[in-house]
Curated annotation (Swiss-Prot):
Any GO CC annotation of this UniProt entry: cytoplasmic exosome (RNase complex)
EC assignment: 3.1.13.-
CDD domains to which the protein is assigned, alphabetical: Rrp6p_like_exo
Keyword RNA-binding annotated: yes
Numbered residues of crosslink Glycyl lysine isopeptide (Lys-Gly) (interchain with G-Cter in SUMO2): 19, 583, 710, 835, 861, 875
Site (Not ubiquitinated): 583
Protein name: Exosome complex component 10
Phosphoserine PTM sites in chain numbering: 823
Biased composition (Basic and acidic residues): 1-10, 778-796
Chief localisation class: cytoplasm
Length: 887
């Protein structure tokens, strides 16, 4: 039944007429609560009325038999469907629930209703979240170029909304500005993207306990090159190459500059005692300084030298640079926050080495694995005495190890991670991004105190757990930045990760595209993902487009550098298509000679903690044939050439092998002496006789036959030998053992000669059956010929088999073999008995019988007689024609 309208309902609020329409939330209702109460009453009334309808079954079928009830149900059902369709149209859902021509099944109508309810409830939840201030649909901030900027159609919506929405919209446009000046263009030193090892940038080593190598000093960097061939190479790298050429290693200039200091570092006793957490100051009460000049950087370094600990964090950008750029550094002390513009002070950041390498000052990082490498790569900065809160969180077995979780756990602060992937190259930085960067280090020192306290309590008031965290942090400080080095086999690593099979042409295209991408990225100082992403490169290699437009079709969106150099890429694809097409190769199949095995496998098998003798071969590749381990003789900078290996007696890998019953190696003349144990084993093996070899002679006559057993009537061997006649006893008795090899050679030669003669005789003497039949009929006045040509062929085949069997049985030497001449044979023997009953089957190749019936004989003779000049008189080499029966 239809619910009563608001106008007809008696419980409508009486105050609706007294209040003006402007103050009403809905027409006839002053506030939302009154409307909810009224709507709830209507829903309850409708539910109660629907419950009073006849139930589906016998009762409903009975009422359905009355026309009035049927008409009432159809009318009310159409009203309900019409209302539901309007609601669905209002919410943008499919509203063809009333159209019986489109939706006829009840299940389909129910599915439409369920989908509409889901949409409505989802929208209600979104509106409730928006009303309560919780917005779950914040868009993540991505680097510029990844999203298409929104086009402003007109000017009326520029200043729409409240002030907060306006500020948020302006920030969004600022983050995704398309035109950003590349900061690499303003750097003093040129970025080194060459395909050479990374050279440390440090030239001054403060807090040093071991001096800096001479090759890394500033005097050596500024000194002109002594060798003219090294003018285009940095001085330190030229010295390294020269040392590799002359094999004179003076100092390892590629080692960690603070290796000695970190190896001998011990945490101060003040940090290994029970800490007293010091609460952080409020963000509004803490001063924040933006460092963008050299004087401010020097002042910052002086302040840091007077602190006992400070927190450090970095913001990095890697999408529009080959090696990446460190765009910002955040430093926080107990009383102040600093944000350093590293793009502006890139060449002067080495000043902070004095405070970062001071072993008396604790540097607090969170997840410093990448930060340590970025500091070395861009600024030549190194860290001594670091505490990594990420390692402490792992040691404490927290639920999560992220900084966001630590802020929520220890400080009760909800961090906003929408700027985590922002483009930090933007200058000037907006206020939101500065606030986000500041929060990363502002609370970190308090978290450091709280985690130290928990580690102290977990270690039973002993600094054991604290020392473990400092040890792990020290290992992170020892990490070194390594440049990506391109080789001819670099593409194989990416190819194996894709887990796809490519043929020779596709793999060649993949290799050429990988080399082109690496060269372009280094030259343009762009990342691999910006030049040509991996999935696009693999798609092009799989498709092998014939036209440049096909390359464009494989990329969506098309990278700018691909569009610029489309012709060069097309030439590479054509070069790959000219390769011969081979079968699909697996990633393991194209694996070439790689580096030497890991040094972790080089352990003594006798004293190792694990038994590695039965380890699978997948984890260890030993390319030597004698089970020894190859070791590299000399270190090599470039590994394209063949590396020489040597065998170390202390690193032999062998498995247990029982060689007692193995056959001796007689390749070197058979002079290998046998030990006593091997002689005994040989005697034992000779006593075991194969029963088949005892009465079946081998072709090479190398099988051992027991003479006593073969001539003993009581033995089974004697019975088998007499039954099967497989071995001639007389021949075995007469044949001397000394002449076995000579006899085998003679028999083989005689067998081959007999085969050749038999084949020649058969070819010469074998006359076609039809010609033989024609000759016989002409000379003997057309007597009855052979009954069946197939029988003759079978006889000939049997004779050939008999002759071949005779040829296989060698005759005694000296007896000549002469094949039988079948041309003088009488083939009447194959004609059969004249009294035999003729076959009931008709054979078209069979001649008519030459009897005394007169007419039949004459007709038969006329069939072969002279009819024209084309038939020769006498013999006919073309045989006889078929005699088909008349109808």
């Amino acid at each position: 039944m239809a619910p009563p309208s608001p106008r007809e309902h008696q419980s409508a609020p009486a105050t609706s007429a007294t209040k003006p329409d402007a103050e009403m939330v809905l027409p006839g209702f002053p506030d939302a609560d009154s409307f909810v109460k009224f709507a709830l009453g209507s829903v309850v009334a409708v539910t109660k009325a629907s419950g009073g309808l006849p139930q589906f079954g016998d009762e409903y079928d009975f009422y359905r038999s009355f026309p009035a009830f049927q008409a009432f149900c159809e009318t009310q059902g159409d009203r309900l469907l019409q209302c539901m369709s309007r609601v669905m149209q209002y919410h943008g859902c499919r509203s063809n629930i009333k159209d019986r021509s489109k939706v006829t099944e009840l299940e389909d109508k129910f599915d439409l209703l369920v989908d509409t309810n889901d949409v409505i409830l989802e929208r209600v939840g979104m509106l409730l979240d928006e009303a309560s201030g919780v917005n779950k649909h914040q868009q993540p901030v991505l680097p510029a170029g990844l999203q298409v900027p929104k086009t402003i159609v007109s000017s009326w919506n520029r200043k729409a909304g409240e002030y907060g929405k306006k500020a948020k919209s302006e920030t969004f446009r600022l983050l995704h500005a398309k035109n950003i000046v590349r900061p690499q263009l303003r750097f003093r030193e040129k970025i080194d993207n060459s395909n050479t090892p990374f050279l440390p940038k440090i030239f001054v080593k403060p807090n040093a306990r071991k001096p800096l190598p001479l090759a890394l000093s500033k005097e050596r960097r500024e000194r002109p090159q002594d060798r003219p061939e090294d003018l285009d190479v940095p001085p330190a790298l030229a010295d390294f190459i020269h040392q590799q050429r002359t094999q004179q290693v003076e100092q390892d200039m590629f080692a960690h500059p603070y290796q000695y200091e970190l190896d001998h570092f011990t945490p101060p006793q003040s940090v290994l005692q029970r800490p007293k957490p010091q609460l952080y100051r409020a963000v509004g009460e803490t001063p924040c300084h933006l460092v963008s000049s050299l004087d401010e950087l020097v002042e910052l370094n002086e302040k840091l030298l007077g602190c006992q600990e400070f927190a450090v964090d970095l913001e990095h950008h890697s999408y529009r640079s080959f090696l990446g750029l460190t765009c910002l550094m955040q430093i926080s002390t107990r009383t102040e926050d600093f944000i350093v513009d590293t793009l502006e002070l890139r060449s002067d950041m080495y000043i902070l080495n004095e405070s970062l390498t001071d072993p008396a000052i604790v540097k607090v990082f969170h997840g410093a694995d990448s930060d340590i490498e970025w500091l070395q790569k861009d600024f030549g900065l190194y860290v001594v005495n670091m505490f990594d809160t990420h390692q402490a969180a792992r040691l404490l077995n927290l639920a999560r190890h992220s900084l966001d979780h630590l802020l929520r756990l220890y400080c009760g602060v909800e961090s906003n991670k929408q700027y985590q992937l922002a483009d930090w190259r933007i200058r000037p930085l907006p206020e939101e991004m500065l606030s986000y960067a500041r929060d990363d280090t502002h609370y970190l020192l308090y978290i450091y105190d709280r985690m130290r306290l928990e580690l102290w309590e977990r270690g039973n008031h002993q600094p054991v757990q604290l020392q473990v965290v400092w040890q792990r942090s020290r290992d992170i400080c020892l990490k070194k930045f390594v440049k990506p080095i391109f080789t001819d086999e670099s593409y194989l690593e990416l190819y194996r990760k894709q887990k796809k099979h490519l043929n020779s042409q596709q793999l060649t295209a993949f290799q050429l595209l990988f080399a082109w991408r690496d060269k372009t990225a280094r030259r343009e100082d762009e990342s691999y993902g910006y030049v040509l992403p991996n999935h696009m490169m693999l798609k092009i290699a799989e498709e092998l487009p014939k036209e440049p437009q096909g390359i464009i079709a494989c990329c969506n969106p098309v990278p700018p550098l691909v569009r610029q150099q489309i012709n060069e890429m097309h030439l590479l694809i054509q070069q790959a298509r000219e390769m011969p097409l081979l079968k699909s190769e697996n990633a393991a199949g194209v694996r070439k000679s790689g580096p030497l095995p890991s040094a972790e496998r080089l352990e003594n098998d006798l004293f190792g903690p694990h038994d590695c003798s039965h380890a699978p071969p997948d984890n260890y590749q030993n390319t030597s044939t004698d089970g020894t381990l190859p070791l590299q003789k000399q270190p090599s900078l470039f590994t394209e050439g063949k590396e020489e290996t040597s065998v170390d007696a202390g690193c032999l890998l062998a498995t247990a092998v029982i060689t007692l019953f193995s056959e001796p190696n007689t390749e070197e003349g058979g002079k290998t002496p046998l030990t006593v144990a091997q002689k005994k084993a040989q005697n034992i093996m000779q006593s075991f006789e194969n029963p088949f070899r005892m009465f079946l002679p081998s072709l090479e006559h190398k099988a051992h036959i027991s003479q006593a057993a073969k001539f003993d009537p009581s033995s089974k061997i004697y019975e088998i030998s007499n039954r099967w006649k497989l071995a001639s006893q007389v021949q075995v008795q007469k044949e001397p053992k000394e002449a076995t090899k000579k006899k085998v050679a003679e028999q083989t030669a005689a067998r081959e000669e007999a085969k050749e003669e038999a084949a020649a005789g058969v070819l010469e003497q074998a006359i076609p059956v039809r010609q033989q039949a024609a000759l016989e009929n002409a000379t003997k006045k057309r007597e009855r010929a052979t009954s069946d040509l197939r029988t003759i062929e079978q006889k000939q085949e049997k004779k050939r088999l008999k002759s071949s069997k005779k040829a296989k049985d060698p005759d005694p030497p000296g007896k000549d073999f002469s094949p039988y001449d079948y041309s003088q044979s009488d083939f009447r023997a194959f004609a059969g008995d004249s009294k035999s009953k003729p076959s009931s089957q008709f054979d078209p190749n069979k001649l008519a019988p030459s009897g005394k019936k007169g007419v039949g004989a004459k007709k038969c003779k006329q069939s072969v007689g002279n009819k024209s000049m084309s038939f020769a008189v006498g013999k006919s080499d073309r045989g006889f024609r078929h005699n088909w029966p008349k109808r």
